[in-house]
Regions:
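Local sequence-structure signature of Cys/Sec-based thiol-disulfide redox active-site neighborhoods
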Residues: 1-21
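Non-globular targeting/processing and membrane-anchoring segments
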Residues: 24-28, 44-51, 62-136
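Flexible, glycine-rich phosphate/dinucleotide-binding loops
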Residues: 10, 40, 76
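Thiol-based oxidoreductase modules, predominantly thioredoxin-like and allied folds used
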Residues: 3-5, 19, 27-42, 60-62
Length: 136
């Protein structure tokens, strides 16, 4: 897997260790981590709605063909943050900043309460594609 990440990103600090643990369990899974900000040529191949969202995990089969991607966070975490963003609409800039800081703190707790299981499930579904028979 090719990974684009940065140490300052909360989603990276939550999800990259999950991938690293899976790589330790699956000998066929090799992981190469690239700092996003130093590899914009790679990053720009995997934009999300035109943005450089991280982490990006890109998985390949033995032939080097892409079989799937995991980008940013699992659906439960994404829904949580979208809800938090909607709740701060109309607040002052300072109130928004404070509320979003709290939301990110709450998200870290939610990862430990189970959101990381969604990350595992998503990655495993991608990896299972390695073993799917060719469609005729």
């Amino acid at each position: 897997a090719v990974v684009l990440s940065e140490s300052w990103c909360g989603d990276c600090t939550e999800n990259v260790p999950v991938l690293a643990k899976l790589a330790s369990l699956y000998p066929f899974l090799s992981v190469r981590i690239f700092p996003r900000d130093e590899n914009l040529d790679i990053m720009d191949r995997y934009l999300t709605l035109g943005k450089r969202t991280i982490p990006v995990f890109v998985f390949f089969d033995e032939a080097g063909e892409e079989i799937g991607r995991f980008i940013e966070r699992p659906p439960g975490a994404h829904a949580f943050m979208e809800s938090a963003r909607k709740k701060v609409e109309g607040l002052s800039a300072e109130e928004q900043k404070k509320a979003m800081y709290q939301a990110r703190s709450d998200l870290r707790k939610l990862y430990r309460q189970g959101f990381y299981h969604e990350t595992i499930s998503m990655i495993r579904k991608i990896l299972e594609k390695r073993y799917e028979p060719e469609n005729s």
